[in-house]
């Protein structure tokens, strides 16, 4: 008779014979370290460091690391193109300073281009990295000549898995960051963005983020000072989240403008935990009216939640006559489709510019106005809180007064 212990031992022997050895299952391989490149800085604004940086991207861009070291200035006198980067890690710990030449930048689309790149980290690990667009001369020239074409600081089109973090970006000639071209999975976090003029000419059109045709874009933990939209959801924006952002001097968190010359759609956008300081509005929607060459504007599933309003002219605004005057819109009413628009948890105090009005909601008479408002506790400096409404639903959620415009 075979004992139970014997059966157990025989079973172990069988298992030991059947199981492959460690050497049979573990491949013989060596993990190679990531390539790392540090471009050589020319040390003078008369030397363009872009070729050296692009050579580093060519050498180390395929899965490697490119380092802009601390306490070092790189002078960029031409467009920096990230072509050649694939899953690369571009670490800015020093200063990238672009030339202020208005002659060179006139008509250029961007200062930094990221086109059809799959995998890019553009970041500062230590938080000391700065990208300086050196835009003062461009702002001054634009004040004299509005036909002057200024570049975007960082232009992302196409591609996926883009991360921009830890940096300070300052003084772009035009927009800070533009995302379009069906870009997917882009994250922007822990950024400081400021456009501050040292002349009487304002830093016009310095949107912090223009988010166009793209999916799954996240903007979080960003402090912005500028003179245009804080974040603009442009045509084609889909699944965009904005949270824990503060904006000073801006035109707000804005959908649009939409419908200027084509049918435009923005959908599935969510903005929460936003602090808006001294801005023309905290949040809003801008759509062109019907008629002429204008297209149909559609905004679906947009939520604005937990906004602190500090000295903004309006807490929330809906414009259905954007870009046209009242006479035009009387003949060609707004026809925008607004569906699933949620505004909730707004607190704070507006500026005295529109006192006692704190919100101006002018939906188009030919359109759809599916808007709900709750927890809206914004006051004007006088202590009143008047909300102007036009063509809004009866279950809007707030008490309306007539006289909406825009």
UniProtKB/Swiss-Prot annotation:
Q: Where in the cell is it found?
A: Secreted
Signal sequence span per UniProt? 1-18
Enzyme Commission code: 3.2.1.-
Keyword Cell wall biogenesis/degradation in the entry? The reply is: yes
Q: What is its main location?
A: secreted
Q: What does this protein do?
A: Pectinolytic enzyme involved in the degradation of xylogalacturonan (xga), a galacturonan backbone heavily substituted with xylose, and which is one important component of the hairy regions of pectin. Activity requires a galacturonic acid backbone substituted with xylose.
The protein's name: Probable endo-xylogalacturonan hydrolase A
Q: Which organism is it from?
A: Aspergillus oryzae (strain ATCC 42149 / RIB 40) (Yellow koji mold)
């Amino acid at each position: 008779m075979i004992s139970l212990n014997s059966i157990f031992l025989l079973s172990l022997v069988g298992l030991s014979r059947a199981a492959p050895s460690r050497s049979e299952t573990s491949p013989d391989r060596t993990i190679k370290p990531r390539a790392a490149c540090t471009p050589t800085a020319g040390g003078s604004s008369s030397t363009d460091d872009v070729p050296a940086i692009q050579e580093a991207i060519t050498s180390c861009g395929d899965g490697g690391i490119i380092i802009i070291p601390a306490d070092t200035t790189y002078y960029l006198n031409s467009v920096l193109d990230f072509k050649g980067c694939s899953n690369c890690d571009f670490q800015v710990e020093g200063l990238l300073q672009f030339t202020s030449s208005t002659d060179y930048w006139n008509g250029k689309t961007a200062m930094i281009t990221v086109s059809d790149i799959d995998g890019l980290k553009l970041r500062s690990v230590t938080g000391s990295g700065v990208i300086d667009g050196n835009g003062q001369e461009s702002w001054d020239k634009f004040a004299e000549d509005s036909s002057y074409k200024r570049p975007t600081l960082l232009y992302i089109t196409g591609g996926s898995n883009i991360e921009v973090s830890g940096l300070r970006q300052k003084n772009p000639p035009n927009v800070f960051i533009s995302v379009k071209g069906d870009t997917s999975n882009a994250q922007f976090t822990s950024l400081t963005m400021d456009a501050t003029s040292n002349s009487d000419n304002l830093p016009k059109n310095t949107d912090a983020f223009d988010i166009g045709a793209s999916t799954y874009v996240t903007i979080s933990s960003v402090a912005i000072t500028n003179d245009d939209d804080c974040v603009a959801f442009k045509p084609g924006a889909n699944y965009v989240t904005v949270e824990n952002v503060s904006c000073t001097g801006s035109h707000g968190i804005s959908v649009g403008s939409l419908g200027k010359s084509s049918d435009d759609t923005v959908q599935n956008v969510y903005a929460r935990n936003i602090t808006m300081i001294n801005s023309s509005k905290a949040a809003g929607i801008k759509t062109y009216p019907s008629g002429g060459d204008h297209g149909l504007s559609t905004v679906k599933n947009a939520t604005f939640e937990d906004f602190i309003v500090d000295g903004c002219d309006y807490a929330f605004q809906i414009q259905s006559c954007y870009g046209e005057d009242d006479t035009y819109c009387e003949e060609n009413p707004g026809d925008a489709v607004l569906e699933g628009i949620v505004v909730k948890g707004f607190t704070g105090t507006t500026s005295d510019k529109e006192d006692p009005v704190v919100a101006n909601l002018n939906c188009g008479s030919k359109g759809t106005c599916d808007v709900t408002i709750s927890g809206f506790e914004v006051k004007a400096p006088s202590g009143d809180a008047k909300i102007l409404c036009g063509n809004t639903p009866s279950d809007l959620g707030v008490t309306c007064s007539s006289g909406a415009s825009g």
